[in-house]
């Protein structure tokens, strides 16, 4: 069993600084760094993945469009959508990228089935679907065995912006959300359902759960830790030279 830290960000988070925070965490982490899962909701934004094509953005309007470094095509993020950013060491977990994606899909589908929603993955396209409607999108990046980015689960949101794009590069793909099947639905209830399943399916111990009001935790926890390690290395190097 491995340790994991779960961070729940309390406010709507703009995409750009969150993306930069993920990159920083991944670049600085070491083999002993504890895995983290970040739960949050974004301010409205379209994100274009590495495989994204301009023709799949039909009309972004006043919603910003950001080209990012995750896999996949264009999608929408906004209030009422649960983002789970998975900052994991796949080598330590013994997971290939393919198995990682399948485990995410199966875990999300299992959580939705607990709400009576007949969700499942598809062999031909990443994500989780209810019939032919997509309820959860997955976009990842893996560097040196460390994953970042994650999944977007539609809970209780305005789905209208999806009509301004070809979601995930599929013309005419319909989107759905938990609220269409379970109404009312609360975001915290969805988290309480999905967290234990992620812990079980990925082999994690009970997590440390932290509520964050901003991205300052990255500076407080990780950059300081990295600086301390760098200082220790410099001290050792200097002592050897002396």
Swiss-Prot record:
TM region positions: none
Residues of the active site: 168
Source species, domain of life: Bacteria
InterPro entries: aa-tRNA-synth_II/BPL/LPL, BPL_LPL_catalytic, Octanoyltransferase, Octanoyltransferase_CS
Main location class: cytoplasm
Site (Lowers pKa of active site Cys): 134
An individual GO BP term: protein modification process
Pathway connected to this protein: Protein modification; protein lipoylation via endogenous pathway; protein N(6)-(lipoyl)lysine from octanoyl-[acyl-carrier-protein]: step 1/2
Residue ranges annotated for the BPL/LPL catalytic domain, each copy included: 31-206
Catalytic activity of the protein: octanoyl-[ACP] + L-lysyl-[protein] = N(6)-octanoyl-L-lysyl-[protein] + holo-[ACP] + H(+)
Intracellular or extracellular location(s): Cytoplasm
Gene Ontology molecular functions: lipoyl(octanoyl) transferase activity
UniProt EC number: 2.3.1.181
Similarity comment text for this entry: Belongs to the LipB family.
Described purpose of this protein according to its UniProt entry: Catalyzes the transfer of endogenously produced octanoic acid from octanoyl-acyl-carrier-protein onto the lipoyl domains of lipoate-dependent enzymes. Lipoyl-ACP can also act as a substrate although octanoyl-ACP is likely to be the physiological substrate.
UniProt protein name: Octanoyltransferase
């Amino acid at each position: 069993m491995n340790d994991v830290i779960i961070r729940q960000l309390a406010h709507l988070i703009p995409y750009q600084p969150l993306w930069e925070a993920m990159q920083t965490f991944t670049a600085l982490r070491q083999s002993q760094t504890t895995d983290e899962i970040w739960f949050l909701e974004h301010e409205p934004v379209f994100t274009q993945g590495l495989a994204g094509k301009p023709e799949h953005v039909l009309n972004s309007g006043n919603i910003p469009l950001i080209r990012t470094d995750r896999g996949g095509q264009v999608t929408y993020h906004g209030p009422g959508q649960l983002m789970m950013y998975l900052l994991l060491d796949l080598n330590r977990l013994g997971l290939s990228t393919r198995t990682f994606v399948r485990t995410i899909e199966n875990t999300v589908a299992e959580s939705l089935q607990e709400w009576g929603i007949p969700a499942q993955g598809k062999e031909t396209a990443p994500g989780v679907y209810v019939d032919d409607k997509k309820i959860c999108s997955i976009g990842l990046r893996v560097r040196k065995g460390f994953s970042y980015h994650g999944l977007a689960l539609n809970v209780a949101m305005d789905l209208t912006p999806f009509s301004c794009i070809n979601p995930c590069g599929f013309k005419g793909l319909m989107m759905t959300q938990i609220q269409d099947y379970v109404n009312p639905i609360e975001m915290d209830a969805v988290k309480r359902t999905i967290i234990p399943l992620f812990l079980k399916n990925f082999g994690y111990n009970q997590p440390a759960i932290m509520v964050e009001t901003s991205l300052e935790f990255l500076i407080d926890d990780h950059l300081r830790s990295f600086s301390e390690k760098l200082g220790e290395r410099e001290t050792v190097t200097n002592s050897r030279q002396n």
